[in-house]
């Protein structure tokens, strides 16, 4: 019984430490995501990705520069970057790909002078498509990083 209690305590300590590390890295944990209130603002544009890629496309750099300019003019604002995928691939793969997309977007904004502690990331994988159709056009719209302002 003592061994079982020690094991459970160690597991709980490990879970708490993992949550702390995720928060430190700016990755939004499910608990934080539920508690955060966010809103979309028209000044922050979404960017899109090529199939199975997480690198920033040339056509996204101008959008990210505008987003960075707006953030520099609004220094008290924190944002959440959501990584999204199309429906192709497994749910697990797409969650990881969405996270890579959100993180590459975050890193690019940091390279433009935005402080890392103002940017949080979360992946929704394929769970929140903006176009539910099953076509290349729909898939290309769904492969995106979406920006929200954290209001609370």
Report residues per predicted region.
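Periplasmic OmpA-like peptidoglycan-binding domain that tethers envelope proteins to the cell wall
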Residues: 82-152
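Periplasmic peptidoglycan-binding/tethering modules of Gram-negative envelope proteins
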Residues: 1-78, 152
């Amino acid at each position: 019984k003592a061994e079982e209690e020690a094991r459970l305590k160690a597991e709980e300590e490990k879970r708490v430490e993992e949550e702390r590390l995720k928060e430190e890295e700016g990755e939004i944990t499910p608990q934080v995501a539920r508690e955060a209130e966010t809103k979309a603002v028209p000044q922050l544009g979404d960017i899109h990705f090529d199939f199975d890629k997480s690198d920033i496309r040339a056509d996204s750099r101008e959008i990210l520069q505008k987003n960075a300019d707006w953030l520099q003019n609004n220094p008290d604002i924190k944002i959440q970057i959501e990584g999204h995928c199309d429906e192709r691939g497994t749910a697990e793969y797409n969650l990881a790909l969405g996270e890579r997309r959100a993180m590459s977007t975050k890193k690019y904004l940091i390279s433009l002078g935005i402080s890392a502690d103002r940017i949080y990331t979360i992946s929704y994988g394929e769970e929140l498509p903006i176009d539910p159709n099953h076509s290349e056009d729909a898939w290309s719209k769904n492969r995106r990083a979406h920006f929200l302002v954290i209001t609370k």
